[in-house]
């Protein structure tokens, strides 16, 4: 799962988005 602080596809609407 996408969690803040982890580079993940923003398509999930989560993560920092970096």
Curated annotation (Swiss-Prot):
Task: Relay the cofactor remark from the entry.
Answer: Binds at least 14 chlorophylls (8 Chl-a and 6 Chl-b) and carotenoids such as lutein and neoxanthin.
How is the protein disposed in the membrane? Answer: Multi-pass membrane protein
Show the stretches that span the lipid bilayer: none
Domain remarks in the Swiss-Prot or TrEMBL record:
The N-terminus of the protein extends into the stroma where it is involved with adhesion of granal membranes and post-translational modifications; both are believed to mediate the distribution of excitation energy between photosystems I and II.
**Ribosomal protein in keyword set:** no
User: What family, per the record?
Assistant: Belongs to the light-harvesting chlorophyll a/b-binding (LHC) protein family.
* Subunit structure as annotated in this protein's UniProt entry: The LHC complex consists of chlorophyll a-b binding proteins.
Q: Name one GO cellular component term.
A: photosystem II
Keyword Magnesium appears in the UniProt entry: yes
Under which name does UniProt file this protein? Answer: Chlorophyll a-b binding protein 22, chloroplastic
Judging by the UniProt lineage, the source's domain of life is Eukaryota
Annotated keywords: Chlorophyll, Chloroplast, Chromophore, Magnesium, Membrane, Metal-binding, Phosphoprotein, Photosynthesis, Photosystem I, Photosystem II, Plastid, Thylakoid
Q: What does this protein do?
A: The light-harvesting complex (LHC) functions as a light receptor, it captures and delivers excitation energy to photosystems with which it is closely associated. May channel protons produced in the catalytic Mn center of water oxidation into the thylakoid lumen.
Q: Where in the cell?
A: Plastid, Chloroplast thylakoid membrane
Q: PTM details?
A: Photoregulated by reversible phosphorylation of its threonine residues.
- Which source organism does the UniProt entry give? Pisum sativum (Garden pea)
- Coarsely, its chief localization is plastid
- What biological-process terms (Gene Ontology) are attached? photosynthesis
Q: Which GO terms describe its molecular function?
A: chlorophyll binding; metal ion binding
């Amino acid at each position: 799962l996408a969690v803040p602080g982890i580079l993940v596809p923003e398509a999930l609407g989560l993560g920092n988005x970096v």
